[in-house]
Amino acid sequence: MEEFISKDVKSNLTKLGLYQIFGGSVGILIIIWAIYTSPLLTGLTVLVYLFILLFYAYSIFCGTLCLKTKKNALGHSVTNQILQVIGFAIMGFAFNYVSGLYLTIGLDLTDSIKLDFGAGISKFDFNLNNEKDRLEVDFNLVAFAVIFWINKLMKKVKEEAIIIQTSSIGKT
């Protein structure tokens, strides 16, 4: 990708990369703090923490790809953001992953219909067979915005690649 991107695209890739590395790093620090302050660490708890660390490591991986302007950087970054768009809890299972900033709007249907808002930096909620009465869904508006930004970048990269390729036709 390096050979056919403008300074503007490279600047945006750098910003996206730093954002994802920042979010992943904050998430890892939160997990380390949770492990350090946990009163009881069982094998299952450690396994869950390692599972969560994989998500934040993936965010750092995506950011690194962006900084190195790798061809698959934007594809991986979209995947990373899609994982962050929707958080939910239903029948004892909950999943809510955010690496970076979040601004959420959600519905809590546990006891009644309640509109929720949230904001912060990096979070992870994972429950398996726990809080079975909990029923909620959250939408991360920041992740939506980042996906939109990445899609614009993808289009711009494709356009620039086509311009470079067509301008090189006939040159030898």
Map each language-model feature to its residues.
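Topology signature of small-to-medium multi-pass alpha-helical membrane proteins
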Residues: 1-172
